[in-house]
């Protein structure tokens, strides 16, 4: 009986392998992933370290044909303008001259306005409605330029006198005094300039030397009846 129990106990004994000796089939895969990631990082670093190539700007060559065409067109326009001017009548030439003169005057006006630091006059004197000091300054520059166009007329001085008088009527006595002082200062400066110019003209006149020829003396004798030529003819 005891032998039977021992036999049964022996038969139930199962030898199991040590769990510590089991080989994990996933073992080492983490190491492979770490190696792969480090390799990818190195590749990215190499890509970043590569110098970036800058593309040189493409130089556009000038179109010689287009340039020549534009020059030819400009030449034809100038030639056509010369022909147009040559075929003009006297009246048309005068009108063209006045047109060019007007353009020049407008250009001079623009230069004057730029000198005074004012803007464009827009629609002319009627377009002005000055309110500020700068706007009155601009209006005055435009009005002065417009009036100065008639300075060559013999009636211009009288016109200015009447204009100043009519404008000063609207001023107080104190303001008129300021205008008077300003005009007197301008008068003094004008006198100095005119005197200096007169002295220069007189100095130039004195510097001129009149030259006389020998024939001038003979002419003088002839004026007083001493005609040697007639005496010689009578002798012959």
Swiss-Prot record:
GO molecular function, one term: translation initiation factor activity
GO BP annotations, alphabetical order: formation of cytoplasmic translation initiation complex; regulation of translational initiation
Disulfide cysteine pairs (residue numbers): none
Keywords assigned by UniProt, alphabetized: Coiled coil, Cytoplasm, Initiation factor, Protein biosynthesis
Compositionally biased residues, Basic residues: 201-210
Chain segments carrying region Disordered: 1-88, 188-236
Bilayer-spanning residue ranges: none
Gene3D superfamilies tied to this protein: Eukaryotic translation initiation factor 3 like domains
Signal sequence, start to end: none
Cell compartments where the protein resides: Cytoplasm
Compositional bias annotation for Basic and acidic residues: 47-58, 68-88, 188-197
Compositionally biased residues, Acidic residues: 28-46
Sections of the chain in a coiled coil: 61-112, 174-209
Main location: cytoplasm
Entry GO terms, CC: eukaryotic 43S preinitiation complex; eukaryotic 48S preinitiation complex; eukaryotic translation initiation factor 3 complex
InterPro entries hit by this protein: eIF3-like_dom_sf (IPR023194), eIF3j (IPR013906)
Domain of life, per lineage: Eukaryota
Chain's role: Component of the eukaryotic translation initiation factor 3 (eIF-3) complex, which is involved in protein synthesis of a specialized repertoire of mRNAs and, together with other initiation factors, stimulates binding of mRNA and methionyl-tRNAi to the 40S ribosome. The eIF-3 complex specifically targets and initiates translation of a subset of mRNAs involved in cell proliferation.
Family stated for the protein in its record: Belongs to the eIF-3 subunit J family.
Subunit-structure text: Component of the eukaryotic translation initiation factor 3 (eIF-3) complex. The eIF-3 complex interacts with pix.
Official protein name in the record: Eukaryotic translation initiation factor 3 subunit J
Organism (species): Drosophila virilis (Fruit fly)
